[in-house]
């Protein structure tokens, strides 16, 4: 299958623009995925502690079927404010659901907990959301920057035993093309678990043996060894949030199924994952730029497999490109 797949930049998935807002000093930021002409959306919320906006709107039985942006943000629940800035900027550009006197942009959002990483009093706000949209639409980067940027600025992994032995992670992106079908993924990797490269089996980032060590320990084995005495000091402070994008035309139900299938990428690249202390959320946006006839010929299961491939690669990229920051070591040299 690898001989048929072409690795492309996520910015080459038709119908979408991407932008970051980064506050490196405060250790937080946000990332926006904009669909200027709208996209059909779906979502899978699998973690036990999500911070999100407009996820109920994406349920297949609900009325609105067009999404104009997804905002991935730091700041925990405070970071949901950035989505209001995204909506405000899109409205000013005439992007949104027509409602008579104006347009209402449909903006979904999820946040990671990064308040313990940098300055907990600084969170992505309305101005941050506006800045991210302006980067996406005014500068239209050909390549989405990864690592310590956007929603990945304050992301960390390997936190089973607390912050002293965790590692830096960040924003990751990847995309693949199979003929005219394009599927991409953007992810903020802020997991309780370790990141493993599913293609090699090697640890990329995660819990270290000690604060002064670079050796990564298998968190699952550590948990088994600790048995009932294990305590998790960072309850509800972990979330891996992501957005799948595709040029295929989908219904809301189909987009939701792609999100559900894409959750396999978390299991492939993060160990453990979907814990009660993670708020794992996966959005899917379908632009339909491939066209109705060509899209109808694409099996939904195939699309889901492509989403898994893109997302697991993006997760690994988010860990590999993260640099040491605020005293927490990263895998990028």
Named regions from a protein language model:
Residues 2-77, 81-84, 92-333:
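A structural signal for small-residue-enriched, beta-sheet-centric alpha/beta enzyme cores
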Residues 87:
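Acidic/His-rich segments in extracytoplasmic proteins that coordinate ligands and/or metal ions
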């Amino acid at each position: 299958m690898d001989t048929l797949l072409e690795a492309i930049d996520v910015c080459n998935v038709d119908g979408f623009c991407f932008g970051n807002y980064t506050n490196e000093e405060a250790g937080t930021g946000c990332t926006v995925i904009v669909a200027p002409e709208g996209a059909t959306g779906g979502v899978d919320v699998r973690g036990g502690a999500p911070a999100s906006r407009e996820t109920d709107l994406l349920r297949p039985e609900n009325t609105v079927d067009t999404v104009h942006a997804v905002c991935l943000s730091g700041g925990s629940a405070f970071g949901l404010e950035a989505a209001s800035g995204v909506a405000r900027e899109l409205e000013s550009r005439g992007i949104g659901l027509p409602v008579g006197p104006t347009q209402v942009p449909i903006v979904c959002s999820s946040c990671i907990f990064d308040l313990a990483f940098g300055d907990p009093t600084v969170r992505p706000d309305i101005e941050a959301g506006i800045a991210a949209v302006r980067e996406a639409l005014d500068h239209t980067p050909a390549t989405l920057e990864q690592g310590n940027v956007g929603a990945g600025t304050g992301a960390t992994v390997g936190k089973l035993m607390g912050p002293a032995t965790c590692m830096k992670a960040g924003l990751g992106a990847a995309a693949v093309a199979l003929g005219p079908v394009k599927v991409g993924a953007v992810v903020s990797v802020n997991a309780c678990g370790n990141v493993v490269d599913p293609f090699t089996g090697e640890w990329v980032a995660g819990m270290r043996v000690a604060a002064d060590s670079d050796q990564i320990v298998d968190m699952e084995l550590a948990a088994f060894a600790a048995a009932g005495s294990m305590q998790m000091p960072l309850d509800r402070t972990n979330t891996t949030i992501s957005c799948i994008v595709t040029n295929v035309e989908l219904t809301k139900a189909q987009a939701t199924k792609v999100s559900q299938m894409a959750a396999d990428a978390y299991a492939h690249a993060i160990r453990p994952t979907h814990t009660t202390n993670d708020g794992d959320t996966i959005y899917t946006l379908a632009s339909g730029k491939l066209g109705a006839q060509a899209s109808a010929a694409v099996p939904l299961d195939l699309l889901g497999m492509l989403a898994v491939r893109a997302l697991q690669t993006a997760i690994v990229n988010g860990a590999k490109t993260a640099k040491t920051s605020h005293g927490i070591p990263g895998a990028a040299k």
